[in-house]
């Protein structure tokens, strides 16, 4: 039975969560942990759970991966609400906001190379914003006036990031013309009405930049809940880029229970995937999830 939504989570309305994979390869165990954690959180609060495919980086995408991800989620018993949102269908919205930010002097073009930024100490110093004749091409950076340096995570507690990282004017459109993750994720979470972002701790620092962008855009930010990362060794997470093994679509029961154990939850009877998820939702306890950024997997 689903728990009653608490107003502490989303005073503006019903809980809305999401899982937003990139189609750069098949889902692996780390992906399953993120999907499961966000699903259990949303369903245990009686909320909606949405799927978004973050397909705005074609050089990293694998043909057919988006469909494979959806079929894998189905094989694991996940049921999502509404239609799947593809970021590639949202580029007009991204560009409209970029144009608005540029017109308001809340963003500017930058032509500094990585080598030049390294010479600045690795943190960009905003020099292109000070030019008498501004650039009209290159990467686009946000004028980071909000400079959010800390926030409260609903699992990890108070999160504080490095001052230089928090104050840097960060890129919101790349020099190759592709929209940066920070811009797309903020606009899409706002567009979909996401009330709480549940994802891995590899993105925990990025939340401060996203909060700065929310303020610049005049948008209401969601709450945050970052889950432990599945790592092979300290600092080396399972990822598609690291060629992590795809989870088995034919036999989901063992992987589901392994992911539940990883999240500190009790295992469930290995019946159908859908029945397992229903039981896992009914007994989900956020307080049991380990409050650590990494968990090293053992053989």
Swiss-Prot record:
Pfam families: tRNA-synt_1c (PF00749). L-glutamate binds at residues 18-22, 54, 181, 199. GO terms for biological process: glutamyl-tRNA aminoacylation; tRNA modification. InterPro entries: Glu-Q_tRNA(Asp)_Synthase, Glu/Gln-tRNA-synth, Glu/Gln-tRNA-synth_Ib_cat-dom, GluQ/Sye, Rossmann-like_a/b/a_fold. The keyword Nucleus does not apply. GO terms for cellular component: cytosol. A motif ('HIGH' region) lies at residues 21-31. It comes from the Bacteria. Its EC number is 6.1.1.-. One of its GO terms (molecular function) is ATP binding. Its cofactor is Zn(2+). Zn(2+) binds at residues 110, 112, 124, 128. ATP binds at residue 240. Binds 1 zinc ion per subunit. Keywords: Aminoacyl-tRNA synthetase, ATP-binding, Ligase, Metal-binding, Nucleotide-binding, Zinc. A motif ('KMSKS' region) lies at residues 237-241. Catalyzes the tRNA-independent activation of glutamate in presence of ATP and the subsequent transfer of glutamate onto a tRNA(Asp). Glutamate is transferred on the 2-amino-5-(4,5-dihydroxy-2-cyclopenten-1-yl) moiety of the queuosine in the wobble position of the QUC anticodon. Belongs to the class-I aminoacyl-tRNA synthetase family. GluQ subfamily. NCBIfam families: PRK05710.1-3, queuosine_YadB. PANTHER family: GLUTAMATE--TRNA LIGASE, GLUTAMYL-Q TRNA(ASP) SYNTHETASE. This is Glutamyl-Q tRNA(Asp) synthetase. It comes from Shewanella oneidensis (strain ATCC 700550 / JCM 31522 / CIP 106686 / LMG 19005 / NCIMB 14063 / MR-1). The gene is gluQ.
């Amino acid at each position: 039975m689903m728990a009653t939504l608490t107003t502490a989570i989303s005073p503006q309305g019903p809980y809305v969560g999401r899982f937003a994979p990139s189609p750069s390869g098949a889902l692996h165990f780390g992906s399953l942990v993120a999907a499961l954690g966000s699903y259990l959180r949303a369903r245990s609060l009686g909320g909606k759970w949405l799927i978004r495919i973050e397909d705005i980086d074609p050089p990293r995408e694998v043909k057919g991966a988006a469909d494979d991800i959806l079929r894998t989620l189905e094989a694991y018993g996940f049921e999502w609400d509404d239609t799947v949102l593809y970021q590639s269908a949202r580029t007009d919205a991204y560009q409209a906001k970029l144009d608005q930010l540029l017109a308001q002097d809340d963003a500017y073009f930058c032509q500094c190379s990585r080598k030049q930024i390294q010479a600045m100490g690795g943190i960009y110093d905003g020099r292109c914003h000070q030019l008498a004749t501004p650039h009209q091409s290159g990467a686009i950076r946000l004028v980071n006036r909000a400079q959010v340096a800390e926030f409260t995570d609903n699992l990890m507690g108070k999160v504080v990031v490095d001052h230089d990282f928090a104050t840097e004017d960060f890129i919101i459109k790349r020099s190759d013309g592709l929209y940066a993750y920070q811009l797309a994720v903020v606009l899409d979470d706002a567009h979909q009405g996401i009330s709480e972002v549940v994802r891995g701790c590899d993105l925990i620092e990025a939340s401060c930049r996203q909060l700065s962008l929310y303020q610049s855009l005049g948008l209401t930010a969601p709450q945050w809940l970052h889950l432990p990362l599945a790592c092979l060794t300290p600092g080396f997470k399972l990822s598609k880029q690291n060629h992590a093994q795809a989870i088995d679509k034919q036999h989901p029961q063992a992987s589901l229970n392994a992911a539940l154990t990883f999240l500190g939850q009790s295992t469930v009877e290995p019946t159908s995937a859908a029945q397992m998820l229903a039981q896992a939702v009914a007994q989900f306890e956020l307080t049991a999830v380990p409050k650590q950024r990494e968990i090293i997997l053992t053989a």
